[in-house]
Amino acid sequence: MPPSPVENPARRSLLLLGGLAVGGMLAGCAAIQQQNREPTEEPSPEPSRKPERDAPKKPVLYLYPTRTMDLSVSLDYEGTLTYTYPTPQARADGGVTWQVTAAPDGDLTDASGRHYPSLFWEGKGTTILTQDEGFVVEADAATAFLEDKLSTLGLSEREAAEFITFWGPRIAERGRALVTFASEEFARQAIYRFTDPSSGAEIVPDTFIRVYIVVGDAPQTAVREQKLVPAPARTGFTAVEWGGTER
């Protein structure tokens, strides 16, 4: 009588190997069907970080008195200051005051003897400056545009160079930007006061030049071109400020 399949070791091995092979094929088919049913999901891109609105970037203040003099420079800003340099004295009313010695060439010295070319601050505002008008600026025209407009608005070549090296790349990187000069509106948000630290007497600059821009993406529709008023000639004690914000 021949042995049963269960009693045949060779046959038992063949059956076991065959079962494993069939099982592997079935598992592979199931995996392929699962892939066909579930399309691969692409990872979501990182959300782009837009520049903050109403956040002044690098307002800097230059001072050019007719003689070397000690000055208290107070700033009242309609918003929150986020950074200042050099560090001013904080006032109880929320404003700040710098104590400096200013020279006719613009050099500023604090009580420790450290020298500065300007007073710097940044903050977050509470209102939105509009862009109802302005200039549409292409990336390759940003430098020439700024040189021309800053000269009209009264910045010296050194001041303009510092402005352009900060704002030029920010305008150009947009490809096509809308640039609005909002100096008067910003001047109502950031108010300076200059006094003699010894007597407390107010010192009013003979010439105060302020340049503040708003940079945004150029819209598809036409924008009314802004008319700029040329700056007055510099006479006497001159103060100069420039800064801006991005949309």
Regions found by a protein language model. Name each.
Residues 30-32:
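Bacterial signal peptide processing site
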